[in-house]
Amino acid sequence: MILNAESKIAFVWGNGESRRKADKMYSNFWGDMRMIGTHYGCNAMYRDMVLDHLVVIDTDMLDELSKDKNKYADHYPVWTGYRNPKQWGTKVKNIPKNKRWNAGTSAAHLAVQHGHNVVFLIGHDLEPCANGLTNNIYKSTNNYRKVFEDDIVYDRFYQDWQEMLTAANGGVTLY
């Protein structure tokens, strides 16, 4: 990887099981990563850390966010595809050029729209767990499927990512 002065780095965090390893691996130098690039996360990730940008697509998650005791959505940028997003918090905005993709794909697309040309995708697993359990670190918590309810059509994730990568239209390197 070659970075230069024109490189604008983003880290886009998904909620797949692989993120558990990444969380442990990066925990000792999270502060350094904050200085290197902008951090985008999805849905319930706000429960664990403050991000530069949070993308929330599900209305139940938006309702949870609006009731958060720390008022996350009134203090930090939150993005969604729904009209009138201010009902969920003063910092909630519409995603420009929203394509109604899943939260992970929408977060990566938002990073590209914000001018990032080097994007690291972390925890975007795009497939079910080998054991058949739900592939999400927030499974069995509020607004998430139970551990045995993996009825997600993963082909849709592939389609969303393919559309997003086409829309990014070159000039962006994804890792």
Which residues does each PLM region occupy?
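Metal-ion/cofactor- or nucleotide/acyl-coenzyme-handling active-site neighborhoods
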Residues: M1-Y175
